[in-house]
């Protein structure tokens, strides 16, 4: 534990270990390495004293006290606020500011527009962490294939795999139904077309990769879902920290015109997610705007990053 904590104050490059000299006086040699598990940074510590060896792995998060509650890029239009929406904290807004709107005869009900400081935003959003962006591009690319020992999906499959061991890859047909499946730890689930997570699925710390991922109503667990087309979280799901949902579409110059009204990432009513939601589309969308949709009584605790549109009817405790 001490070696991992000490490494947080040091620069650790992916694939290169860092020796920690602070432990030499105790006769302990420690080495910390960094790699990515899905989109999450994972650090591994190995400490040796005499003939004893201790290993520890941990996911790493960062707390940024300067991150605003809201950052809306400046596209020469004001932000519109309606209903009972409330912005608490610092907000970066377009030069034209924020104005009260009206939907079906309902205006804005609060006495203040922003409960915090306001600043002018830029035409570009702050970039994702470069390493996270690279991982997302890699894992949503058409040539991506996870590496590891392959296990064929079957009903009642149970896999618990330590991060000290080789990754286990669960695959099967183009469509994977995780009915009554238990997967914990160093496991990747990969499908060519679609993964369906059921309420009977027990998933913890695993990574799901497919063009489309559907999470059934009432699902509980914590995992990463990484897709190139769409993610749907059904009603009443409880996805614990560090859950991560990410969609990145291909960057093509001749994208088809979008005629769908459904969100690219949909969080249905009554669901709670602790972690991060990312939607990245580097190309310009034709037709109807693509968006993240967070329904009424849905709660996100953490960060939402969206470089297109966001329809927020629920609550976000963190940053957008």
Where do the model's predicted regions map?
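Short amphipathic beta-strand and strand-loop transition segments with alternating hydrophobic
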Residues: 16-35
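Short, ordered "entry" segments at domain starts
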Residues: 33-175, 179-202, 207-209, 218-219, ...
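Membrane-proximal N-terminal amphipathic helix
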Residues: 1-12
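Short, glycine/acidic-rich hinge or "gate" loops at secondary-structure transitions
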Residues: 10-16, 104
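Eukaryotic tandem repeat interaction scaffolds
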Residues: 221, 227, 231-290
């Amino acid at each position: 534990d001490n070696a991992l904590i000490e490494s947080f104050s040091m620069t650790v490059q992916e694939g290169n270990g860092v020796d920690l000299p602070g432990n030499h006086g105790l006769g302990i040699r420690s080495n910390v390495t960094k790699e990515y598990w899905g989109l999450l940074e994972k650090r591994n510590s190995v400490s040796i004293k005499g003939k004893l060896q201790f290993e520890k792995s941990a996911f790493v998060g960062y707390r940024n006290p300067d991150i605003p509650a809201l950052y809306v890029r400046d596209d020469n239009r004001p932000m519109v606020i309606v209903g009972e929406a409330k912005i608490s904290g610092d907000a970066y807004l377009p030069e034209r500011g924020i104005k009260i709107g009206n939907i079906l005869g309902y205006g804005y009900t609060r006495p203040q527009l922003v409960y915090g400081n306001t600043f002018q935003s830029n035409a570009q959003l702050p970039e994702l962490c470069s390493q996270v962006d690279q991982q997302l591009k890699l894992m949503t690319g058409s040539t991506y294939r996870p590496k590891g020992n392959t296990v064929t999906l079957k009903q009642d499959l149970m896999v618990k795999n330590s991060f000290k061991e080789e990754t286990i890859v669960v695959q099967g047909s183009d469509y994977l139904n995780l009915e009554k499946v238990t997967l914990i730890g160093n496991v990747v689930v990969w499908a060519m077309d679609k993964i369906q997570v059921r309420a009977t699925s027990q998933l913890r710390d695993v990574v799901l990769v497919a063009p489309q991922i559907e999470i059934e109503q009432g699902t509980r667990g914590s995992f990463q879902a990484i897709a190139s087309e769409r993610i749907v979280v059904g009603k009443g799901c409880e996805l614990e920290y560090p859950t991560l949902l990410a969609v990145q579409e291909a960057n093509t110059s001749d994208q088809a015109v979008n005629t769908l009204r459904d969100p690219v990432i949909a969080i249905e009513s009554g669901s709670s997610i602790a972690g991060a939601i990312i939607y990245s589309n580097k190309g310009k969308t034709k037709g109807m705007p693509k968006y993240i949709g967070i329904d009424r009584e849905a709660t996100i605790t953490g960060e939402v990053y969206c470089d297109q549109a966001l329809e927020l009817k629920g609550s976000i405790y963190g940053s957008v």
